[in-house]
Amino acid sequence: MAEQPGKALVPEIRFSGFTDPWEQRKLDEVASKRIEKNTNEIKETFTNSAEHGIVSQLDYFDHDITNDANIGNYSVVYPDDFVYNPRISTIAPCGPINRNKLGRNGVMSPLYTVFSVDDVINKLYLEYYFKTNSWHQFMFLEGNSGARSDRFSISDSTFFEMPIQCPVLEEQELIASFFNRLDSLITLHQRKYCGVASWMLGVALVRLGSESDGAFGEMKHVLR
């Protein structure tokens, strides 16, 4: 992002047809914190993984670590809501922010910050924005790791002061679409690579089996 006279935000590389500077808005100008608490009507608990995004707790832990007695104070999460998890890791040094793409309601621990976004910002654009480290500097300046070394500490009021770089909606949509297609292409090639790698491993085991006895010899018959 190049900074022009007057501190206008103008990206050095952008789609053709767009010349206006990007705006910098605070998160609370485009999003609102969810304050709705569960009334024990929603039974499914979600978790926010830095690697896998928002997933059902049953899928992530192989069992539900909550029960009806302790989820009454949990926050309700709706489809397309965003969730900040203060748990830090190597790939999420100040905690991950992910979007609920499960297509259903759930509840999450009150340790998480849940927020919905307005129509002034494209949800997919914001999702990719939070996959970058553009917002990390603000977090490191305004928050800290707290008493627990695995938790990032920042107040809600400060969190929602986070600056967000916002082009016009049409440009947001193009940026989001571009990265979405890129992700799909990467996934496709990863699957092809895994398929080729598995085939090569099979060939190697068969060749080894033809040259020796024992387990590799038995493997040859399994792979046929």
Q: How would you label these PLM feature ranges?
A:
Residues 1-224:
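Feature detects amphipathic, helix-rich regulatory segments
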